[in-house]
């Protein structure tokens, strides 16, 4: 069942590169409100913002978003969501989507797709999405995580390295990983409770912990292109510029 999936938006104030990121103004609304509004359109039965900062919580209350305070000690959004899974006693089969709080233009269709994908694969603990990666510079860029799957879409490995490596040259068929995850709550709690593994610490990709623990991750191509994440002032300026252009009346 995915009709009742829950979407959680982890949001923290203390971003290293862009402090206060969730509250940055974009076309008259804080970024977290853009993410919330997009997520509501996904059809989730419930949308919750999970934060450790009262300033973010107050902003969410102002625009009517349900918000839960969580520990400031969490190392990741996954851990923040796992705290809610324990707090609310979510059933182990409950599907929970982790929506990145720094993607104000995130696709509602992709959020729903990730939940639906997990629902279709009862043997999976996580579902996630990809998009084709055709630019060679991005293929070599460690900021773009890549994923290799088997013929049925099961993840074999995620890496910041260029995989699969074209030994004979050329550009292989590469899939860029999109950081949108649907979890079963039981697996989410188990993954969060486990210590980081060596692969995760080397690559700084937390999904590798799930693979290392033996959980299965199903992967599919996203129905829409990935939305830009806001990590820096430059990213923020690009999103603001895009929305300003999009809101201008056609001539």
What are these regions (language model features)?
Residues 107-197:
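Conserved core of the sugar-phosphate nucleotidyltransferase
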Residues 51-52, 106, 183, 231:
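A conserved hydrophobic position in a structured secondary element of the catalytic/binding core
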Residues 44, 92-93, 121-124, 215:
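Short, high-confidence coil segments that cap the C-terminus of an alpha-helix
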Residues 2-51:
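N-terminal glycine-rich phosphate-binding loop and ensuing alpha1 helix
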Residues 7, 47-49, 96, 127, ...:
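Hydrophobic/aromatic residues located in beta-strands of well-ordered beta-sheets
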Residues 172-251:
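Conserved alpha/beta core of the MobA/IspD/sugar-nucleotide pyrophosphorylase nucleotidyltransferase superfamily
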Residues 48, 54-116:
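Short phosphate-binding loop-to-helix
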